[in-house]
Every structure is written in structure tokens, then in C-alpha cells.
Amino acid sequence: MTFLTQVLNGLQLGSIYALVALGYTMVYGIILLLNFAHGDIIMVGAYISWIVMSQLGLSPILAVLLSVAGCTLLGVLIDKVAYAPLRNAPRLSILITAIGVSYFLENGAQLVFGADAKVVPSFIDSSAIEVANLQLSPTALLTIAVTAVSTAILTFLVQRTKLGKAMRAVSEDMGAARLMGINVNTTISFTFAMGSALAGIGAVLYSMAYSQATPTMGVMLGTKAFVAAVLGGIGSIPGAVIGGLLVGFAEVFVSAIGLSVWKDAVVFLLLIIVLIVKPTGILGRTMSEKV
């Protein structure tokens, strides 16, 4: 493969990681929660796509809409059932709950669908397009475009809308935001909805690229997306995108030089190096806390 082809592959994989990392960074930025069930929400979205297209024989467009809607509703439900009752509990309690929700979703999917991988039909024609002797994958181009548009919309919502201002107020000081008349629980639920919707989009793009759904597919995908969020500076939207692209490029280029068995190790090594040099991540900011 040519260098430019590898760059395109890195952009495609990095875009998927970036979308998932955005979900992590949104939730952490509001309530300082590492939602370890986030990767499993992607798994649910992939299974929804498989059911709609393979089992029901419906259109890919409907599969996309139902996957995003299903992930959004699941994210809000998880917040209401598992996290909202622990809003004032110690942070460790919520973290353990998040891990429990993750295991529940994984084992529930295995119980319902079995451990074998389900083949998700391709959404679009995957035949490569040749431009100036460069093989361009329609799936890769669509993935990059969707991620760019999703990031732009998310940035606009957070920076320019009333609800986005409420989200930023809650992230700065939840108590003060409540005193100013902001409905904190509604704001947090909306944050989960947005993060989970991004996970649904990520599920669709991942299914397009790899054409399969398994109960544990969200584990490594979610872990690497979390690494991407931390690399870029968790809580930062541009940081999540930069981190996702770094992880994607690292994986692709390590595989390209024949060291694919080391690609996961290189990703985590990259995280260690960045945190040693800049513990807050590339675009993260240092925060002081009075005790």
C-alpha cells in the first residue's frame, strides 16, 4: 500500500476512535465520571444494525437511525437507573457501578445473541475508487466526513446554544449552576444522550469498516477511545479528536511496517509517554481544587 493509502486508513480508524472519545470526554467534563459502559453502548448499536438489516431485511438508512436512537435512549436509561441515584455518592462508587453496567451489557448480549460474531451487511458499496493512482475507500471517506460534521455540530451545540452554556456551567460548578436555576439532572441526561448518540454513529461506522458485531467488541474499542480522550486532554472536544487520530495513525503505521502484534502495546506506550511529558494531555488544562 502507498503512504497516502495508509494515511487514509489512519484517518478512518482515528475518526472512529475520535467519535467514541468525544462521548467519554463529554460525560467526564460534566460530572467527572469515567463511563466504562460507553464502549458497550457501541456494541448495542452494532447489534441493532445487524437485527435491522440481517434479520428484518430493512434499509440501511433505517438501521442507522435506529442504531443512533437506540444508543441515545440506552445512554439516558443508564444514567437514570445506574448513575443518577449515586450523584452525591463517592466517586469510586460511581466508577464501580460503571464497570458493573459494562459487564451487564456484555454478558446480556452474549446471553441473547451468543458468543459468535454476527456479520453486519455493508451499508454502502465498498469498491475502491481510483483517483490519480490512489485507491480511495468510500467507507473511509464517509467515516472521515461524518466524524468532521459530528464534531462541528457538537462544538456548535456546546459553545453556541443555551443548553451548551448550561452544560459548561454545570461542569464548572454544579452547585452554583443549580442556584442559578439550571436543571442539573436534565443537563446531565442531555450530555449522556449526546455522548451515546455519538457512540451510535461510531457503531454504524465501525460496522461499515469491520462488518461484525460481538458481545465484547466494545471492550478494546472503548479502551482505546478512552486512551484517545486522555491523550488529547479529557474534557476537551478538540483534544478528543486529536487523541483519536493519534491512536488511529499509531495503529495503522505500526501494522504497515509488519508489527501488527505490537499495535495495542504501542498505543498504550504512547499514552504513557504523553502523560509523563504532559499529565493533563495535549490540550488538557491544569485545574486546582481547594480542600
Walk through the language-model features, giving the residues of each.
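Alpha-helical transmembrane segments within multi-pass membrane transporters and channels
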Residues: Y24, G57-V101, G108, I242-V247, ...
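Residues that define the loop-to-transmembrane-helix transition and helix capping
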Residues: A37, I61-L62, L92-S93, K162, ...
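Transmembrane alpha-helical segments in multi-pass inner-membrane proteins
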Residues: Y17-A21, G57-A69, F192-A199, A203-L269
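Transmembrane helix-bundle core of multi-pass membrane transporters
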Residues: P85-R160, T187, S211, F253, ...
